[in-house]
């Protein structure tokens, strides 16, 4: 896959700014990245937009006559609307006509569609959404999972999240020896609720996971950890809070910049620094979160995503494809399962 152009199915009808901003981001990706884009949605609306702009050669339109609204119950909507844009996009991956799906639409519907149409990877009990956060160390990020796929989790789910996050950190983020932390209320192994205590024991005992201990909330962006695992309830709160902090910081900086001629001159001098700051803390720069654990590359973007965020989401999908994240997770699970089977057979024969 790394040697050919990735084919990305984009849910053109999903999101607050669909379809125009979604299409704009997809067009940019088709021009700047080594990808072919399949725009899935109302063909008349998509063609109308493209007629006002030049139609790039690496874009194909796939008609979908239905849309799942944000206020619909996801599972029933997915089953009722088989021709919804997110379902059609997932079917393209299932049929090997696309390598990944990107959607800024109903996140619950995207997860339900992925599970029903693509299924889970062998050895994975629950999917997880992984989000990349900036840290105080320039050029270094941390991936946090789960940030919303599961409100309730079990220790073995978090153990699987840690494994998938480790693989992503190593092969996509380029961290040779990732450090995995468990989000908790204290550094000590005796801290936390029942889920945290039991998960700690599993992570500590798993030699395939480079677990270094508990991570407190203040540690998430410290750069001391490369992977943070938590349940989806806590992770989603953390994600939304981090997004809000970034927006507040940018707004405060805008308000505090001096006014007048001298202020304009100072702002001009600071412009490169301010641009880099925005790139580091703006969630749109990361594009979305990878849905780990399903048998296909799925990127779930923020509902408020505009063209830059969609571009980055497509780039995120491309990175996951080129670095064979799914294949590496599957290979590990198969190896682990075989080792467990061999161990069981050895014990049985000795008895």
UniProtKB/Swiss-Prot annotation:
Instruction: Give one Pfam family, short name only.
Output: FA_synthesis
Q: Does the keyword ATP-binding apply?
A: no
- Which segment of the chain is annotated as a signal peptide? none
Q: Which UniProt keywords apply?
A: Cytoplasm, Lipid biosynthesis, Lipid metabolism, Phospholipid biosynthesis, Phospholipid metabolism, Transferase
Residue spans crossing the bilayer: none
The protein's superkingdom reads Bacteria
Primary localization class, coarse:
cytoplasm
Q: Name one GO biological process term.
A: fatty acid biosynthetic process
Q: Which reaction does it catalyse?
A: a fatty acyl-[ACP] + phosphate = an acyl phosphate + holo-[ACP]
The name on file for this protein is: Phosphate acyltransferase
């Amino acid at each position: 896959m790394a040697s050919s152009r990735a084919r990305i199915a984009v849910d053109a009808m999903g999101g607050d700014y669909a379809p125009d901003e979604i299409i704009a981001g997809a067009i940019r990706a088709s021009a700047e990245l080594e990808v072919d884009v399949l725009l899935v949605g109302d063909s008349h609306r998509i063609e109308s937009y493209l007629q006002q702009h030049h139609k790039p050669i690496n874009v194909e339109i796939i008609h979908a006559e239905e849309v799942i609204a944000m206020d619909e119950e996801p599972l029933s909507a997915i089953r009722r609307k088989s021709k919804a844009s997110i379902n059609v996009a997932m079917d393209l991956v299932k049929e090997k006509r696309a390598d990944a799906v990107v959607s800024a639409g109903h996140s619950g519907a995207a997860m339900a569609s992925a599970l029903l149409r693509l299924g889970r990877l062998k050895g994975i009990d629950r999917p997880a959404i992984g989000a990349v956060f900036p840290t105080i160390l320039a050029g270094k990020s941390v991936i946090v999972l789960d940030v919303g796929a599961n409100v309730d989790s079990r220790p073995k789910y978090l153990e699987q999240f840690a494994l998938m996050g480790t693989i992503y950190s190593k092969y996509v983020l380029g961290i040779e020896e990732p450090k995995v932390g468990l989000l908790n209320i204290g550094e000590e192994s005796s801290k936390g609720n029942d889920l945290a205590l039991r998960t700690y024991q599993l992570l500590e005992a798993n030699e395939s996971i480079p677990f270094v201990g508990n991570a407190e909330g203040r540690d998430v962006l410290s750069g001391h950890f490369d992977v943070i695992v938590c349940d989806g309830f806590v992770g989603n709160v953390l994600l939304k809070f981090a997004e809000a902090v970034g927006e507040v910081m940018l707004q405060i900086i805008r308000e505090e910049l001096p006014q007048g001629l001298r202020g304009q001159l100072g702002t001009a001098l600071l412009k490169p620094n301010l641009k880099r700051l925005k790139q580091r803390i703006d969630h749109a720069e990361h594009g979305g979160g990878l849905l780990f654990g399903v048998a296909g590359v799925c990127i779930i973007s923020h509902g408020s995503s505009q063209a830059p965020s969609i571009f980055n989401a497509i780039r995120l999908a491309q990175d996951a494809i080129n670095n064979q994240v799914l294949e590496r997770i599957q290979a590990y699970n198969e190896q682990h399962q075989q080792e467990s089977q061999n161990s069981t057979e050895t014990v049985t024969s000795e008895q």
